[in-house]
């Protein structure tokens, strides 16, 4: 299977280029009016900087802002499953300079660049070069090959999916978030590393086609392109395997927009579907699903961590036996996010969703997780078995770390609600509320957030995050009970 990947990559590359070279055949009799391009295509690709628009505007768009955020963390007093390390950080601070520019180089060529430079401090962290992190989020060239056909080459943040809290078809999201600046999935998807790829897009009156080929790049450790200390490209996060994506959008039905995706990762196939349906002027129903070949979360987490020889909070010798095991069978497993959005006349939009992850932990696996954690705690309290206890607990907490970095639910059944109120109560005050519940153990996460815009350049924000539930539950077992985050953004 793996030996055929170079051939597959060459075929995919040829297909991507053909979109640009043979676009006219894709749109026999097409009206080239740009209003026919679906909004979700424009929002994620270079067509935003089209030559027609650029001729009446500046040849570039530049956005620069400074973000200063401080966070206070409040520890849960008693943990059923302790972490391997007792270095709980009670505070952290991040100041970031974020730059994004889109430049029209010629009538047919554009250049896009997005970068974030951050200085991060937290309790127990000694000042060093590791406090400084640079994330090159996007850098790519766009060729307007013909009419509404585009080819992108470089690091691109490809975003897929119609849901708000969990996107099963957002196939390039895994490990792409380097700094968790928010618990809001819609914010994280805009602030992550792109993937090095070549992407071709063709848009016509009744639909759109996108092809992506993303090669595996050597992820030998401690190289400038893999350095994870803050100065490298971190391609081990975004290009660790060869991946292909084909996406076809149909725009022929009134108020019904189907989108079909086919994705190959490391030789394994996945099929995805996005479907939206307008129900009147205020309600949009949607479903997003994916089915593909994979092991479960437990197995994938332990395989990944054992291969690297590192846990999120401790280090263990290679070959350490797994404290807990999942189903290592590679078979078809499905994920889904289904729900609706409701927008009222008072600038309030509420999304209610059900999330399903077949690869997530079942109630029985959660019981095994807590049972193994109790045993690890006993070993940790005994000096003779302390090292073993740390390794056991490290394996257990690596599962939590993996699910967070993979941006997928750790449990199988989740309820998600997000409400956004623009100009709430007073002008320029925006309120956001997020509620997420594990439907099996009834533990939940809740986040109220307020953002006040001081003119056009400055925004003040205040957010609280609460992780609540019984001691032996998903959210009730986390080290953090709650935290508060205050920030200020200044746009130049």
Identify the residue ranges that each predicted region occupies.
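Transmembrane beta-strands of outer-membrane beta-barrel pores
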Residues: 68-78, 115-121, 157-159, 204-206, ...
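Residues that define the transmembrane beta-barrel architecture of outer-membrane proteins
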Residues: 89-95, 132-137, 192-196, 203, ...
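Repeated loop/turn-to-beta-strand initiation elements of outer-membrane beta-barrel proteins
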Residues: 107-111, 148-151, 206-211, 218-219, ...
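Outer membrane beta-barrel
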Residues: 102-218, 250, 469
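N-terminal periplasmic/intermembrane-space "pro-region" immediately following the signal or transit peptide
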Residues: 25-88, 100, 104
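Detector for outer-membrane/organellar transmembrane beta-barrel domains
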Residues: 255, 276-436
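Residues on the lipid-exposed face of transmembrane beta-strands in outer-membrane beta-barrel proteins
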Residues: 95-103, 138-143, 198-202, 246-250, ...
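Outer-membrane beta-barrel "beta-signal"
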Residues: 177, 415-417, 478-492
């Amino acid at each position: 299977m793996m030996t055929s990947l170079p051939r597959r990559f060459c075929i995919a590359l040829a297909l991507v280029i053909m979109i640009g070279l043979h676009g006219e055949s894709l749109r026999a009799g097409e009206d080239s009016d740009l209003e026919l391009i679906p909004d979700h295509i424009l929002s994620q690709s270079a067509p935003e900087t089209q030559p027609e628009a650029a001729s009446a505007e500046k040849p570039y768009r530049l956005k620069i802002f400074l973000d200063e955020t401080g966070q206070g963390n409040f520890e849960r007093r008693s943990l059923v499953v302790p972490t391997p390390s007792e270095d709980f950080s009670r505070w952290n601070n991040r100041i970031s300079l974020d730059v994004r520019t889109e430049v029209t180089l010629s009538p047919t060529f554009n250049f896009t660049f997005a970068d974030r430079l951050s200085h991060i401090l937290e309790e127990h962290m000694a000042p060093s070069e590791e406090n400084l992190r640079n994330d090159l989020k996007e850098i790519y060239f766009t060729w307007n090959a013909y009419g509404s056909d585009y080819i992108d080459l470089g690091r691109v943040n490809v975003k897929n999916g119609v849901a708000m809290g969990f996107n099963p078809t957002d196939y390039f999201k895994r490990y792409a978030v380097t700094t968790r600046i928010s618990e809001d999935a819609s914010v994280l998807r805009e602030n992550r590393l792109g993937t090095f790829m070549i992407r071709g897009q063709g848009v016509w009156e009744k639909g759109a086609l996108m092809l992506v080929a993303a090669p595996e790049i050597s992820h030998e450790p401690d190289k400038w392109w893999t350095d994870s200390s803050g100065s490298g490209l971190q391609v081990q996060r975004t290009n660790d395997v060869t991946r292909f994506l084909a996406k076809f959008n149909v725009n022929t039905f009134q108020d019904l927009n189907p989108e079909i995706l086919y994705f190959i990762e490391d030789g394994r196939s996945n099929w995805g579907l996005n479907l939206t349906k307008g129900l009147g002027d205020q309600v949009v129903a949607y479903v997003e699903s994916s089915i593909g070949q994979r092991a479960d979360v437990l197995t994938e987490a332990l395989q990944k961590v054992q291969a690297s020889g590192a846990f999120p909070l401790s280090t263990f010798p290679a070959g350490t036996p797994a404290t807990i095991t999942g189903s290592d069978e590679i078979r078809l497993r499905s994920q889904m996010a289904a729900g609706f959005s409701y927008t009222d006349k008072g600038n309030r939009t509420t999304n209610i969703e059900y999330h399903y992850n077949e690869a997530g932990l079942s109630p029985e696996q959660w019981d095994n997780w807590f049972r193994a954690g109790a045993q690890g705690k006993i070993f940790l309290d005994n000096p003779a078995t302390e090292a073993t206890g740390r390794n056991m607990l490290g394996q257990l907490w690596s599962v939590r770390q993996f699910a967070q970095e993979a941006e997928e639910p750790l449990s199988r059944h989740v309820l998600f609600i997000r409400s956004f109120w623009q100009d709430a109560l007073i002008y320029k005050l925006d309120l956001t509320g997020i509620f997420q519940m594990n439907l099996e153990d009834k533990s939940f996460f809740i986040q109220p957030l307020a953002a006040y815009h001081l003119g056009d350049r400055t925004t003040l924000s205040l957010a609280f995050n609460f992780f609540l539930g019984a001691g032996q539950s998903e959210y009730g077992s986390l080290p953090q009970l709650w935290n508060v985050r205050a920030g200020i953004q200044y746009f130049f």
